[in-house]
């Protein structure tokens, strides 16, 4: 298991944006939907962060987000 920023797909490499003020469990639900233990909205990056993701779940790499893939 790993703790990291989930991405939509490994090819696109785009994180899930969130709003710390209006999160309402969005990131926690998103992470649990990907079989993680829990998740939250990391305010400094305005992105969802997951704890306990399966090792094969796609997570952010050093490459840029490419929404056109």
Swiss-Prot record:
SS bonds (residue pairs): 14-65, 18-41, 27-48, 31-50
Domain of life: Eukaryota
Domain annotation LCN-type CS-alpha/beta: ranges: 2-66
Places the protein is found: Secreted
Keywords annotated in UniProt: Disulfide bond, Ion channel impairing toxin, Neurotoxin, Secreted, Toxin, Voltage-gated sodium channel impairing toxin
SMART domains: Knot1
GO function term, MF aspect, one: sodium channel inhibitor activity
Presence of keyword Protein biosynthesis: no
Gene3D superfamilies attached to this UniProt entry: Knottin, scorpion toxin-like
A single cellular component GO annotation: extracellular region
GO BP terms, alphabetized: defense response to insect; envenomation resulting in negative regulation of voltage-gated sodium channel activity in another organism
Keyword Disulfide bond: yes
Tissue: Expressed by the venom gland.
Domain notes: Has the structural arrangement of an alpha-helix connected to antiparallel beta-sheets by disulfide bonds (CS-alpha/beta).
Similarity section: Belongs to the long (4 C-C) scorpion toxin superfamily. Sodium channel inhibitor family.
Known role: Inhibits voltage-gated sodium channels (Nav). This toxin shows insect lethality against crickets.
Protein known as: Toxin Tma2
Source organism per UniProt: Tityus macrochirus (Scorpion)
């Amino acid at each position: 298991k790993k703790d990291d920023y989930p991405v939509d797909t490994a090819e696109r490499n785009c994180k899930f944006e969130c709003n710390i003020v209006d999160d309402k469990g969005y990131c926690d639900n998103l992470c649990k939907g990907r079989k993680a233990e829990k998740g939250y909205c990391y305010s400094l990056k305005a992105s969802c962060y997951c704890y306990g993701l399966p090792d094969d779940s796609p997570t952010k790499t050093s490459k840029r987000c490419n929404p056109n893939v």
